[in-house]
Amino acid sequence: MPGIHHVTAISGKAERNFDFYTRVLGLRFVKKTVNFDDPTTYHLYYGDEVGHPGTVLTFFAWEHAAQGRAGIGRAQQTAFRVPASSMGYWTHRFVEQGVAHEQIEKRFGESVLPFVDPDGMRAALVGVPGAESEPAWKSRDVPVEHAIRGFHGVTLMLDDGAPTAALLTDALQFSEIGHEGGVRRFRANPGRGGVVEIREAKGFLGGTMGRGSVHHIAFRAADDAEQAALARKAVEDHGVRATEQKDRKYFRSVYFREPGGVLFEIATDQPGFAVDEPVASLGHDLKLPSFLESRRKDIEAVLPPLEVAA
């Protein structure tokens, strides 16, 4: 199924990030590992029970990173799906937990509750009719009837949205389904991770990478063959420059920067997060790729403490 595979962002302190996404939002912590390219940094994964594609939000925990800035060439907002009847619950919960948020607004006929995480990342909950019938992680902190059901989608802020729109519809299997208030909406599927929106803001200040910003957005490929076909289409017909395939242990990845400047990834659905630990204990222990196991003691010595036991 086409759509968003995962979103990777940048956080500050790992412990604060863990507390917010597991205890306030009620997501499952599915993997505790490191940035394979910077193994002194945690790479933290959150999602549903097994980390299905379309539910996974990940963070590079760069504690001393400068604050990111929203603007052109960045993802402006990352949105999650919840049952339409749960918006009142979440508004009350955000007040109770001291989460910075705005009033519920309407977009494309849906109720949207914008909020900000502890590092300034802009996010939202979208009330989706019928989402209550979708599977959800049963956390200790959020009743399952109100739980997050994965991603709704992401909003990109771009100077010129036309080339990105062409890439989405031609190479990444999205269709344009609406336009409202300067925002174009594209959909790949009616379920989780199905929506990408483009907000054009010509001449607006460019965004910068840092705490609270999205690092990249990954799109789904069923297998290596589909990944290669999608990447080839993007390269040959849209002029992007793609990397070679990289093994990220839980999926295989190809990266490219789309015409508007946002870093995109195409990630395979397999092998998934149970490849190195049982589903029942996902996220309990620090997992490393085989090429870093010989450095485990040194890596553990520099990583900050992060207690994740139930």
Please report, for each region that a protein language model flagged, where it lies by residue.
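Core segments of cupin and vicinal oxygen chelate
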Residues: A9-P53, E96, I104-P114, L156-R199, ...
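Non-catalytic surface loops within mature trypsin-like serine protease
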Residues: K13, D48, V82-A84, P129, ...
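Conserved donor-binding loop and adjoining core beta-sheet/short helix segment
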Residues: K31-F36, Y46-F80
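Vicinal oxygen chelate
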Residues: P2-G12, T33, E63-D159, H179-R199, H238-A310, ...
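Surface-exposed interaction/gating patches
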Residues: E145-R232, E236-A242, K246, E258
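N-terminal beta-strand motif that seeds the catalytic metal site of vicinal oxygen chelate
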Residues: M1-R16, A75-V82, G130-A165, T208-R220, ...
